[in-house]
């Protein structure tokens, strides 16, 4: 829908006026349910083959990012926001019904602030009038919007009117208020009851309508980046004073994060983690099997992107499709439509002549408006033809998604014919980009309502009818906020929160919400200057081959559910809101000094990446570098010290938590220290809940300036996950290997290996049946400097595992290799305690790599390693160096 700068609120006194405006903008005419079109074969005249075809290979070239709770530092480690809550502050508090707002008013009054408290049920116009009168002498300093602390109750028990009223109280009135007071740029702190994790935990959102308020808040922050904006989420609770204290505290500290959750005194933001699809040929249990009996309901079906996705689903299923859109059913015999299909530009002349024949001036705006109508008709026809070409059946319904009765009639048809919906794809919506100061209430309600009311009407009509999966079109605007899109962001974040809540309310339905970035080659973002704007922002536009196939990949790869960001490079869209962001690095000085040799200083607490530390390492100072040279010349960071760095960083925020395991470690690229010069590396750890544990998504990265490049090249060298638990792992016992038979001496081992004294951890090795065994060398030189710093992941014991496995590979396969993966490493408390007798390791090869166990002389397990895999070096080990190892390890 094209922006109309002359649109005024007074022109839309009723919903009928709004619907009429949409139909006028899109060229749609009302079509009754009796007019639903059923098409069984494509027409010969329509050339509607999709321009792009979905491709799983293109999907897998992009990261699959999932929002998840990300632990934030305590407020004592955060910098002030700059907000003053005291004399001279004029603060509006929109109250909840549970008493939190009332407690907050008392606290603010004690601080000397002037307060205007308004009930959430207050009519919007009355709210605006009260604020206008109150702000005559002095503008607002800030707003506490607490209406979304109230639980709206089960959504299935609401009717359309109560649904709209619930959203009016929460977000429509919020927009109207900020449209009025935007020039004063008041701070905004909202409260919600999504569960304390903004719905990104395994349990799902509790009161999902609050998601609309959070989406609005994120976009307000993007429009006014210098203003404090916080969306504070809580679990269900009857507490009032404690929550009011939290709201005050969050107002005063940590300006670097909008989405804040509070659970058991712990602070959580929302970060992103990459969760890739499984291999195409190895879908996980719970994957959907699309076929000829599959039933699809798709809204927004006349959009070019949705049409292409429909074609992809149809081609790979041949099922039954119910396509819903405001646009009328396309007539393949329409001469103008056929002209558009043949040559869209030539139709402009025809349209101009038709406008002139009506006695109107054929302006470019009128011509483009009419051309857009034919674009939607062509997209609808393309979807219809794709379904029928695949042998499927298509029913096209021209329907306004805001019309509950019309939507119910369509869904009742499906219920009568099939009794179920396998895939409900809600893509209907429109976007009118306009800043808060210019966006009238009618525009906000229109953009918000098509998505929000459309979803409600669909699910209300479906009732308890089985639905296999729902897929809601969201956008990166909903995930990150976007200037000029407070309505679009609010609606999209609402759909994401509802999808999260369905884990509670409809556990048998896989509810998915996709945060799309701008598409390349197809859709509105390809027009005008948008591609150039995206390029300037560093945002990678979505390859259509990937976007078209993405939904099919989500459905058929496993039991995926929840919110997913579908994008390549996010650029400034996901840029931090604060340079620090929000955290005082000096608050971690003592913790860093006690952590170990791999943590230098805290750089920032990133919203997306978690806690980020930097460390400068020098091969001339650190034995673990000087004695670890891959070609006996260039120092390499040992893989085990990469693991150590991940563990040290992960425990900085929660030093009282114990290391339970290190999981899914990938050694992606060697970290080399060229010419023995120092290098600075960064380690990030994004901590999120995982059942009763905490799981840290970790990366080890470094930058290097290459000749001819203006900017440093950043490389991710290692990735992995650190699992933390409230208690230490339980002690384990295992029988140590029996030392007997032929042996490989330390001299023979390190004639083959490149390690120097500090990493010559094998004293002697031997074969123990179908596995290798080795004894740990005693009296090794220091691993690091200063030597009194602790290590947390027993790096040289894990190195013992690596080297024992490597000896088996040399002796059995004649291959020299480097680490590439560890599925799981467990360092038990005994590894840090006094041990009895010699330490030994066994390394046994299985289908998923080597499993290794390090024990002391009494059989206490110190380290367990699972799934250790390697990658062969390009240069083979000379035969004379292999021979003594092969003589012991080979049959």
Where are these regions (language model features)?
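Phosphopantetheine-attachment site and its flanking helix in carrier
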Residues: 1, 13-20, 102, 207, ...
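NAD(P)H/NAD(P)+-dependent Rossmann-fold oxidoreductase cores
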Residues: 63-186, 241-246, 256-474, 529-548, ...
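Phosphopantetheinylated carrier protein domains
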Residues: 1-13, 26, 216, 221-232, ...
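Acyl-thioester-processing domains in fatty-acid/polyketide/NRPS systems
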Residues: 102, 114, 123, 241-257, ...
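Short beta-alpha connecting loops at secondary-structure transitions
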Residues: 2-7, 162, 442-445, 478-484, ...
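Phosphopantetheine-dependent thiolation modules in NRPS/PKS and related acyl-activating systems
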Residues: 1-43, 874-880
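Flexible, glycine-rich beta-alpha linker
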Residues: 193-204, 208-247, 270, 326-332, ...
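Glycine-rich loop motifs involved in handling phospho/adenylate chemistry
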Residues: 2-16, 188, 202-206, 301, ...
């Amino acid at each position: 829908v094209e922006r109309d700068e002359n649109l005024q609120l007074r022109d839309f006194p009723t919903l009928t006026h709004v619907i009429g405006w949409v139909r006028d903008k899109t060229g749609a005419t009302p079509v009754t349910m009796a007019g639903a079109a059923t098409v069984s074969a494509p027409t010969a005249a329509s050339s509607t083959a999709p321009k792009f075809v979905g491709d799983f290979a293109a999907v897998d070239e992009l990261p699959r990012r999932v929002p998840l709770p990300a632990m934030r530092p305590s407020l004592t480690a955060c910098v002030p926001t700059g907000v003053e809550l005291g004399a001279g502050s004029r603060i509006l508090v929109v109250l909840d019904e549970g008493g939190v707002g009332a407690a907050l008013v008392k606290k603010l009054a004690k601080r000397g602030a002037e307060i205007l408290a308004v009930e959430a049920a207050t009519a919007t116009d009355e709210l605006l009038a009260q604020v206008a009168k109150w702000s005559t002498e002095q503008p607002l300093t800030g707003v506490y919007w607490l209406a979304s602390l109230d639980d709206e109750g089960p959504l299935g028990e609401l009717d359309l009117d109560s649904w709209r009223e619930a959203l009016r109280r929460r977000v429509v009135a919020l927009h109207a208020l900020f449209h009025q007071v935007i020039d004063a740029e008041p701070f905004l702190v909202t409260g919600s009851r999504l569960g304390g994790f903004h719905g990104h935990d395994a349990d799902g959102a509790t009161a999902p309508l609050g998601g609309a308020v959070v989406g609005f808040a994120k976009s307000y922050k993007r429009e006014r980046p210098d203003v404090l904006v916080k969306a504070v989420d809580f679990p269900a609770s009857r507490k009032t004073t404690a929550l009011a204290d939290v709201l005050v505290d969050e107002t005063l500290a940590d300006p670097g994060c909008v989405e804040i959750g509070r659970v058991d005194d712990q602070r959580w933001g929302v970060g992103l983690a990459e969760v890739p699809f499984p291999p195409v040929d190895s879908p996980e249990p719970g994957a959907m099997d699309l076929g000829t009996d599959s039933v699809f309901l798709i809204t927004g079906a006349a959009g070019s992107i949705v049409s292409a996705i429909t074609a992809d689903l149809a081609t790979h299923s041949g099922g039954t499709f119910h396509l819903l859109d405001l646009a009328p059913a396309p007539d393949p015999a329409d001469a103008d439509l056929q002209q558009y299909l043949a040559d869209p530009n030539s139709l402009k002349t025809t349209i101009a002549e038709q406008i002139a024949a009506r006695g109107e001036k054929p302006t470019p705006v009128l011509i483009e408006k009419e051309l857009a109508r034919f674009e939607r008709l062509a997209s609808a026809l393309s979807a219809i033809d794709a379904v029928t070409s695949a042998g499927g059946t298509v029913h096209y319904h021209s329907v306004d998604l805001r019309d509950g009765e019309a939507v119910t009639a369509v869904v009742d048809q499906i219920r009568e014919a099939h009794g179920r919906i396998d895939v409900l794809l809600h893509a209907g919506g429109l976007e009118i980009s306009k800043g808060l100061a210019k966006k009238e209430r009618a525009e906000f309600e229109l953009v918000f309502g098509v998505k929000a009311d459309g979803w409600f009407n669909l699910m209300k009509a479906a009732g308890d009818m089985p639905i296999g999966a729902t897929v809601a079109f969201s956008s990166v605007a909903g995930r990150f906020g976007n200037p000029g899109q407070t309505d679009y962001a609010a609606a999209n974040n609402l759909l994401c929160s509802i999808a999260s809540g369905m884990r509670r309310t409809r556990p048998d339905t896989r509810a998915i919400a996709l945060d799309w970035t701008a598409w390349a080659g197809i859709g509105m973002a390809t027009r005008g200057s948008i591609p150039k704007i995206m390029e300037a922002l560093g945002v990678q536009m979505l390859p259509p081959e990937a976007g078209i196939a993405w939904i099919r990949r989500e459905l058929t790869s496993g039991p995926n559910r929840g919110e997913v960001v579908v994008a390549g490079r996010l650029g400034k869209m996901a840029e931090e809101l604060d340079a620090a962001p929000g955290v005082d690095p000096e608050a971690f000085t003592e913790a860093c000094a006690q952590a170990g040799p791999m943590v230098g200083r805290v750089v920032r607490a990133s919203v997306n990446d978690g806690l980020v530390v930097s460390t400068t390492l020098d091969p001339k100072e650190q034995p673990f570098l000087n004695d670890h040279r891959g070609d006996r010349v260039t120092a390499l960071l040992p893989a085990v010290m990469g693991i150590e760095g991940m563990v040290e960083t992960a425990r900085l925020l929660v030093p009282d938590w114990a290391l339970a395991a290190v999981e899914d470690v990938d050694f992606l690229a060697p970290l080399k220290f060229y010419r023995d010069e120092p290098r600075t590396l960064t380690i990030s750890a994004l901590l999120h809940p995982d059942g009763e544990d905490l799981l840290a998504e970790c990366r080890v990265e470094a930058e290097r300036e290459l000749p001819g490049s203006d900017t440093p090249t950043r490389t991710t060298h290692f990735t992995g996950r650190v699992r933390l638990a409230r208690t230490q792992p339980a002690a384990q016992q295992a029988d140590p290997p029996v030392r007997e038979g032929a042996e490989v001496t330390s001299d023979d081992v390190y004639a083959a290996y490149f390690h120097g004294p500090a990493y010559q951890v094998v004293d002697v090795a031997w074969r123990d049946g179908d596995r290798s065994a080795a004894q740990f060398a005693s009296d090794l030189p220091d691993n690091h400097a200063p030597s009194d710093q602790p290590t947390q992941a027993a790096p040289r014991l894990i190195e013992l595992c690596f080297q024992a496995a490597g000896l088996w590979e040399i002796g059995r396969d004649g291959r020299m290799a480097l680490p590439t993966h560890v599925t799981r490493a467990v360092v038990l408390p005994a590894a840090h305690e006094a041990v009895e007798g010699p330490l030994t390791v066994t390394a046994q090869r299985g289908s998923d790599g080597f499993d290794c166990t390090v024990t002391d002389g009494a059989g206490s397990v110190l380290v367990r390693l699972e799934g250790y895999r390697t990658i062969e070096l390009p240069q083979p080990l000379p035969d004379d160096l292999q021979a003594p190892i092969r003589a012991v390890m080979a049959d």
